[in-house]
From Swiss-Prot:
GO cellular component, one term: GATOR1 complex
Protein name: Nitrogen permease regulator 3
GO terms under biological process: cellular response to amino acid starvation; meiotic cell cycle; negative regulation of TORC1 signaling; positive regulation of autophagy; TORC1 signaling
Biased composition range(s): Basic and acidic residues: 118-133, 217-250
Keywords attached to this entry: Meiosis, Signal
The species this protein was found in: Coccidioides immitis (strain RS)
Primary gene name: NPR3
Taxonomic classification: Eukaryota, Fungi, Dikarya, Ascomycota, Pezizomycotina
Region (Disordered): 33-140, 186-257, 594-638
Signal peptide: 1-23
Function: Mediates inactivation of the TORC1 complex in response to amino acid starvation. Required for meiotic nuclear division.
Pfam families the UniProt entry points to: HTH_NPRL3, NPR3
Tagged with keyword Signal: yes
UniProt keyword annotation of Iron-sulfur present: no
Amino acid sequence: MSSVVRPPDPCLVAIILITCSRAGPRFVYHYPPNPSIASAPSRSNSRTKPSPRASDSSPSSDNEEGSSSDEDDLSQTPRIGSPRPTNVRRLSSGSPSTKAASQQRKSNLGGSELDDTETPRDGRRSERSHELENPPWDSFLGLGTDVWEKLLCPSSSWHKRRFEVGVNDLTFVGWPVFVREDGTWRKKRKKKKTRAGDSVLDTAPTLGSEKGGYADGGEKLESERDPNVDGRSDKDEEPSRSLIESHPDEDGSVTDGTKDAMTMFNVVFVMNPPILEHNLRIKENYDNVIKKFGKGLKSEQATANYVWKEAQKILHIKEKGRENKSSLSSVYEELLSQSSLAQAIATIYRSISTSKIASITLTPHTTMSLQIPPLTSTPYLPGPMEPAYPGLWLTTADSLSATDEVTEMEYSGPSKVLAKHFALLLLSDEASILKDIEASMGTLGPPLAHYIRSSKPTKSFAQISARSSIPLNDIQVLAAHLIYWRRARAVPPLNKQDTYIVSPNCDLSKLGLATAAYELAFPTMPSLPKMLAVLSGTPRPYASFIPSRDHKGIYYDILAWLMRGGWVTQLRTFGWIKVDQELKSAVEEALASEEAKEREEELASSTATVIRVNEPQTDDGASTSSSSLDSEHSNATPVQERFAHFQGHQKGHDPAQISSLILRPHRASPLEARWLDEIISRFPDDHLADRANESEDFEGEVSIHRYWNAFTKYFNGTDALEKIPVREGLSRKLVWRLLSRIDISSNPADGEVHRNEKVLVTVRHW
């Protein structure tokens, strides 16, 4: 069982292919043949006027005509949890023509409202002749295709930009691509010699099947490394192999010199999202499917004039069906069997609308994989009015924390950072995954199988790399590959000293099925209800449930099984540094003393200057001058007293009278930095050196001063303290001994604890 939840309903109604040549726009193809919006969710605030909209594009991204970044980063995925909200500003680019609007009002997406001057008999007669002249594939949602082709063919200013049109409750979203002014589809680039150091992961072809085609996702992340490594930039890269792999481009671009050559194509996705989820559903479909599919077609069009040839083939089949008066089903059967582009669009619709991975083949040398990333975890429980996903992994472990360093690699999923300290948890049986890999017969298969056999959920990527001699970068690529294909999940390494509890988000409705599956996997172990009952008690380390050393392996397998199904989650500890009033007062007094000292030094410096200026005077004069200055200084309010008066005024406010928490110690303000310095200066540390030699299991000199700087960056409330041993390379025993000494809520058994050490406030949650 797996806790990976498929994405919500993508709200996909249909997919349309629009092309434009010098002869005008053409509605080439749509799938499914008879789209329906009857089952779509109702919306109270319908849009009545079509209005094209597009998102703002930065000069370096979608809206850059001469840049090749859009056609070269076919594998890049936007930043799952993300977490990656972007503000989209929609700009109106006008409204459809009066004729189109009139036809829309008459038809009303299939309505039969008659014109004022038309009699019912004339209406029926014209309707019958219309059916004879126009076959069913020449209409879409009750309107003629000539209406849609005008509406969905934007101007060249929308080149490689998000094109969005609203018609009633439907939203039409596309990524139009226009031919360049020189008649080509992309800039010519100099060929680069293949580097001698390329590994098998850099050259492995796609495998092209949803079940066994693991190479797509793996190379997807291989190509998402920093493009500027080794001096290469985005503009120097060939189209990424993650989503598309094509034969070499001999001349950089292919053009058709005929009079009716194509100048634009636009694959439009028709969606009907709920009002409250409109922006989210549109964005995730555009970022993960629409834009990437458009980039793939753009590359193939530049290479082999692919889109234009397929469009001509589709139009020819439809024209032949018109002449032969073929049925709609027979025409679509022929289209799907003879046109790879029509088949690809149909596959995308069927897969994306059911929240699956769409694996498509454009040419024998070109394959793509598209998907809307699934939900793998949630950091919070849903509210009364929020959608619930029972069984989803409840954790904050894969959320970006304050100290996380953004790596060079991204992947398609809610986790934005695939850190080297994570481990890989397979979501299905290892044997079945290895069987699928062997059946795929890809060049990525052997290293992928080797990594799966070497991987354990108790070992991090860095540890597996050290043990198996697999480069860490390759391990991250292979792990991200399995995650992309929904066969694994990145988790903190399982450890018996960690605490695990029954997840509040577990799906108890599946307890019966899960119990049967659990008994098949662990027939001699305690039953699933018993394990859940034990873990529901007072939280304690998982090691306390393991009866003996011989049972450690099987109990780790049980824990992995429970984590995989979302039945348990790790209870983690988070902390902040507390600054009490006494420490604040001490720092304020120190600051006041320093300021008074600085003023005295400035005053002494100005006095010395006056004396030097009056040097020619007699000794009496100098004495008089000095006495005058001293008298003036004595008559003024003393600096220290004035500052104390100011501080007394400040103390009347609440912030100076209450304790504070330092939320970001690694980015502390100047005042917070002084608080931290004062805290560490108060730590008593002399008695620890003597105790280090009294016990053999006391691991060296446990000095808070020594580890304070390494620990403080984790005291931000977002980084679990369980990360410290893994990331700092320290033993868990040493780390928790130190943390228990400074934790306000704990009393370690080391002996007397000094009051000044208690500065850490901790909480526990997932």
